Design a protein with these regions (language model features):
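Metalloprotease/metallohydrolase-associated module, dominated by Zn2+-dependent proteases
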Residues: 46, 66-76, 93-126, 152-231
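Short, well-structured alpha-helical interface segments that form or flank functional binding sites
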Residues: 37, 61, 130, 134, ...
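Generic beta-strand structural signal
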Residues: 86-88, 113-115, 132
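Single-residue recognition of alpha-helix boundary sites
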Residues: 42, 148-152
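A metal-dependent hydrolase signature that marks the N-terminal structural subdomain at the beginning
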Residues: 1-105, 110, 211-213, 217-230
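Short glycine/proline-enriched turns and hinge-like loops at secondary-structure junctions
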Residues: 82, 127-128
Length: 231
């Protein structure tokens, strides 16, 4: 039995709808009832998480783009919200982190319950389909942390499929085959956590190529996210 979000009323926010129609192919491809579901989740995200600008004024469109990126990633999950972060900090561009004395484009800090983005890099990742998407990347880290800590059904499936992904990562022959294909960027092979984050960037940015080149791995990620392909 599937939970039906459409049993509950929700009035569409016209400003939000305009942003989603313009900026998200994923949203445009949904059926009308699914669009309402998507809008409701974006609206709830904006209401439930704090957005803090550092040397930048955060407007509604910025919040909507960030929230919708998270909703794209979690759209198939019944339990999609997480307590692994409560605040999203936005810098105009790359920022200096005192934690490891280096410049960052983005990060997930579970101890401080923060997601941090360089807006310049977030926007570039959103606009350009080059398999580099900062929003998807950092939110994947947060979702994995949630999956490792939580016992809800969505988290358990995510965790279970991550364990399969780790088996791929630990298989040196398989990794060598991936490197030969040169589809995933080198950063994917840093560790198993970055491997998953990069995989999901590719999953959403160039799904047809991913599915064609690595169908078994693609199916694992579909199950992980309870993702339904748009025909």
């Amino acid at each position: 039995m599937h939970w039906n979000p459409f049993l509950f009323g929700f009035d569409s926010n016209l400003k939000l709808v305009s942003i989603l129609e313009k900026e998200f192919i994923f949203y445009r491809n949904l059926e009308s009832r699914q669009k309402i579901y998507f809008e409701k989740r974006v609206d709830k995200f904006i209401q439930n998480y704090s957005f803090v600008g550092k040397e930048i004024l955060v407007n509604y469109e910025m919040k909507a783009l960030i929230a919708a990126t998270y909703v794209v990633l979690t759209f198939g999950m019944r339990n999609y919200r997480t307590t692994m972060f409560n605040t999203i900090i936005i810098y105009p561009s790359t920022y200096y982190s005192t934690i490891n004395d280096t410049y960052h484009k983005g990060e997930f800090n579970p101890r401080m319950k923060l997601i941090v983005f360089s807006w310049e890099d977030f926007l570039s990742g959103h606009k350009v389909k080059d398999n580099i998407n900062l929003g998807l990347h950092e939110f994947t880290h947060a979702l994995l942390f949630h999956a490792l800590k939580s016992k809800d059904a969505s988290a358990m499936i995510f965790h279970e499929e991550f364990n399969f992904v780790v088996k791929y990562f630990d298989n040196e022959d398989f990794l060598n085959a991936l490197r030969v294909k040169n589809y995933f960027r080198a950063y994917a092979y840093t560790n198993k956590f970055e491997f998953l984050a990069v995989l999901l960037e590719h999953f959403f940015e160039t799904p047809n190529v991913f599915k064609s080149e690595f169908p078994e791995l693609f199916e694992r990620l579909k199950r992980m996210l309870n993702y339904k392909e748009i025909q």
